[in-house]
Swiss-Prot record:
Protein name per the record: tRNA-specific 2-thiouridylase MnmA
Residues holding ATP: G9, L10, S11, G12, G13, V14, D15, S16, M35, G124
Entry's Gene Ontology BP terms: tRNA wobble position uridine thiolation
Taxonomic source organism: Cupriavidus metallidurans (strain ATCC 43123 / DSM 2839 / NBRC 102507 / CH34)
Gene name for this UniProt entry: mnmA
Disulfide bonds: C100-C197
Active site as annotated: C100, C197
Keywords, comma-separated and alphabetical: ATP-binding, Cytoplasm, Disulfide bond, Nucleotide-binding, RNA-binding, Transferase, tRNA processing, tRNA-binding
Primary role: Catalyzes the 2-thiolation of uridine at the wobble position (U34) of tRNA, leading to the formation of s(2)U34.
Length: 359
């Protein structure tokens, strides 16, 4: 029976719950695993761990599966959160969900699942895995492109993908909700989580301020005119419009203000007016810390598509260079607010090839 034993990551949400139910219907021996990956005061206004665990227990009872809780808080702190703080301190805007998937959900969690005698794991991610004719495992977009999460999974390798199931990859999100209601899941109408991976719905600036000091400095236009003061470069990201503190018209223009650049050396935040200001547009990018799903980079000169942020439409591009740990892309059309620290992820149609961290 162990050949059909699968450990499902249960978060308390509807996606992972339906994932467990679908696999049980397919004849798998399903074990549920609830991960606690953040240590905080359970009485915190924003801490949902206790309620999530109660939801998991209720779902497991309805589906008829065993469930256990495991604490990966130490691993998360060392492998994900430390990098998160380093990146923000350096003025970049990291995407912790990408690293969390590679290091926690598909490494620490996978290792624990194997210790339980399982051959595979499953999560409620919207993505697909298939084995190509050459034997390599491919990561593909979900059929429901509006919910596709392959962007967050692009750092998964062959060993991880070969032991992973994504049952929701071929199901529209609307149908997932319908299934949850039809089988009587208590969390069928629970809203989707939108906070940082495992940190929840806390106000982000308040959360970051607990770990990084504020270092106020000048806010300038490209011409060097001081138009305000920022609270610290770590608290802003390229393309940001809200929370800058520059409302109304300036210099006769009614256009909104956007964060355009950060100068760490002078602790200066540069802002511009207008969504399509030249400082917000770029036709090339460089990326490092590369990871390729098949273990090999794309060939220089290859044409494909890239995403530089989640939910962005695929942008046609050309691989200028991909050697060692350096990737350079050239886009057919200028890209808006390409942000250092975020991931540039390459696609060949629906196939996610991998990517790296924008420099």
């Amino acid at each position: 029976m162990s050949g059909k034993r699968v450990v499902v990551g249960l978060s308390g949400g509807v996606d992972s719950s339906v994932t467990a139910w679908l696999l049980k219907q397919q004849g798998y021996e399903v074990i549920g695993l609830f991960m606690k990956n953040w240590e905080d005061d359970d009485d915190s206004e924003y801490c949902s761990t206790r309620q999530d665990w109660l939801d998991v227990a209720s779902v497991a009872d309805v589906i008829g599966v065993d469930v256990e809780a495991v604490n990966f808080a130490a691993e998360y702190k060392d492998r994900v959160f430390a990098d998160f703080l380093r990146e923000y301190s350096a003025g970049r805007t990291p995407n912790p969900d990408v690293l969390c998937n590679a290091e926690i959900k598909f490494k620490a969690f996978l290792d624990h699942a194997m210790s339980l005698g399982a051959n595979t794991i499953a999560t409620g991610h919207y993505a697909r895995v298939r084995q190509a004719a050459n034997g390599k495992f491919e990561l593909l977009k979900a059929f429901d492109h509006t919910k596709d999460q392959s962007y967050f999974l692009h750092r998964l390798n062959q060993a991880q993908l070969s032991r992973t199931l994504f049952p929701l990859g071929e199901i529209p999100k609307t149908r997932v909700r319908e299934i949850a209601a039809e089988i009587g899941l208590p969390n069928a109408k629970k809203k989707d989580s939108t906070g940082i991976c495992f940190i929840g719905e806390r106000p982000f600036r308040d959360f970051l301020n607990r770990y990084l000091p504020t270092q106020p400095g000048p806010m300038k236009t490209p011409e060097g005119k001081v138009v305000g003061e920022h609270i610290g470069l770590a608290f802003y990201t390229l393309g940001q419009r809200k929370g800058i503190g520059l409302g109304g018209s300036r210099d006769g223009s009614g256009d909104a203000w956007y964060v355009a650049r950060k100068d760490m050396a002078s602790n200066t935040l540069y802002v511009v007016q207008g969504h399509d200001h030249p400082w917000l547009l770029t036709s090339e990018l460089n990326a490092a810390d590369l990871s390729w799903v098949a273990g090999e980079p794309p060939a220089a000169g290859a044409t494909m598509a890239a995403k530089t942020r989640y939910r962005q439409s695929d942008a046609p591009c050309r691989v200028v260079a991909a050697e060692g740990d350096a990737l350079k892309l050239s886009f057919a059309e200028p890209q808006w607010a390409v942000t250092p620290g975020q991931s540039a992820v390459l696609y060949d149609g629906d196939v996610c090839l991998g990517g790296g961290i924008i420099q």
